[in-house]
Each structure stands twice: as structure tokens, then as C-alpha cells.
């Protein structure tokens, strides 16, 4: 059960990073101190930035 809880937390961190990227926040806005969660947040943020670069999101 422990692994699932950790995975869910990391998936949530990635989703929040993605949302932050979609609205154009800087990567320094990452709220996570834990390296695992921070890495997932930044991964989501990078995915969103790539989407913005390819015109996936319009303001």
C-alpha cells in the first residue's frame, strides 16, 4: 500500500507542475522541496512548456 500512496503523490505533483506550465508560471514556482516530488513537478512543467511551444494552448 505504501508504494501506491507514494506514486499517487508523485502523479499529483506532476499534474500540478503541468497545470503551472500551462498557465505560464516559471519553474522556480515549484512548491515542492522533496527531490522526488520536485522532479515530477518539473517533468510535468516541461511537458506543458513543450505543448505551449507547439501551440497546444492558446491564451
Swiss-Prot record:
InterPro entries: Ribosome_modulation_factor (IPR007040), RMF_sf (IPR023200). It is found in: Cytoplasm. The keyword Cytoplasm applies. Its main location: cytoplasm. NCBIfam families: PRK14563.1 (NF011162), Rmf_CrpP_fam (NF041886). HAMAP family: RMF. This is Ribosome modulation factor. It comes from Aeromonas veronii (strain B565). The gene is rmf.
